[in-house]
Swiss-Prot record:
One of its GO terms (cellular component) is cytosol. It comes from the Bacteria. Homodimer. Substrate binds at residues 9-11, 174, 212. The active site is at 96 (electrophile), 168 (proton acceptor). The lineage of its organism: Bacteria, Bacillati, Bacillota, Bacilli, Bacillales. Involved in the gluconeogenesis. Catalyzes stereospecifically the conversion of dihydroxyacetone phosphate (DHAP) to D-glyceraldehyde-3-phosphate (G3P). This is Probable triosephosphate isomerase 2.
Length: 254
């Protein structure tokens, strides 16, 4: 049984230690009754230490929004996995569409980051998703298969279970509406089929949906058989909104 999972990516919206403290201090008490759902936050990078201090001793996971493909070295401006370990972080976001589109991250670099995170026992939340809406399920599966095969080409299939896939269709990120639920379920089902075809155990891999998640669509999305949780964006900037999403997932999947 895959445990439901809800995460939030703060991107560069809540950027000060004071803002992050305020959000966490308001949110943590609201999550006390939802032990059947795992939660995590990717805070603005400059607030990671504040986040680590406030989440110490809780089950609320956290980590950076990116990491270097190497442990250490001449990588100016990157964030080392050694720093992640030092902070006792347990997640790392890898391959977000904005990293690829704005900073031109290559698939080969993303694949190295995934492997490094797995080697260091940190859970990589790997973002995948097509750039434009597919016309049918075959087109959708083919688009996702190209991504998964490239990203996981050198990773042992026995490690797939330690990865979280965040399905985020690029055309739905930051938009007014999410993808429709039939489309979302088709994508999640396709991802499981791809994992199985590569030799992995698709029943062990958690796949969550991100892209214009809100209170209004959360329940319908997580009712889908192959959806294990949600990856929240700006809607979760209000602590009660994030807690409401966790509550919905708990009631629907817990």
């Amino acid at each position: 049984m895959r445990k439901p999972l809800v995460g939030i990516n703060m991107k560069n919206y809540i950027n000060t230690r004071a803002q992050t403290s305020e959000w966490l201090e308001a949110t943590i008490p609201l999550l006390g009754n939802f032990s059947d759902v795992d939660t995590f936050i990717f805070p603005s990078m400059g607030t990671l230490e504040t986040t680590a201090n406030l989440l110490a001793g809780t089950s609320f996971g956290f980590g950076p929004q990116n990491m270097a493909p190497e442990k250490s070295g001449p990588l100016t401006g990157e964030f080392s996995v050694e720093s992640i370990i030092d902070l006792s972080a347990n997640y790392v976001e890898i391959g977000h569409a904005e990293r690829k589109n704005l900073f031109h991250e290559k698939t080969s670099e993303i694949a190295k980051k995934i492997q490094l995170a797995l080697d260091e026992k940190i859970t990589p939340v790997v973002c995948v998703g097509e750039g434009i809406r597919a016309n049918d399920t075959n087109e959708l599966k083919n688009a996702l298969k190209k991504q998964i095969e490239a990203l996981f080409d050198t990773i042992q299939v026995t490690q797939f279970k330690n990865v979280v896939l965040a399905y985020e269709p690029e055309w739905a990120i930051g938009k007014a509406n999410s993808a429709d639920t039939d489309y979302i379920e088709s994508a999640h089902q396709a991802l499981r089929e791809i994992i199985r075809e590569l030799g992995g155990d698709e029943t062990l891999v958690r796949i969550i949906y991100g892209g214009s998640v809100s209170k209004e669509n959360a329940a319908e999305i997580v009712r889908q058989k192959n959806v294990d949780g949600l990856f929240v964006g700006r809607f979760g900037h209000k602590p009660q909104n994030f807690a409401d999403i966790v509550s919905i997932v708990s009631k629907t999947k817990g």
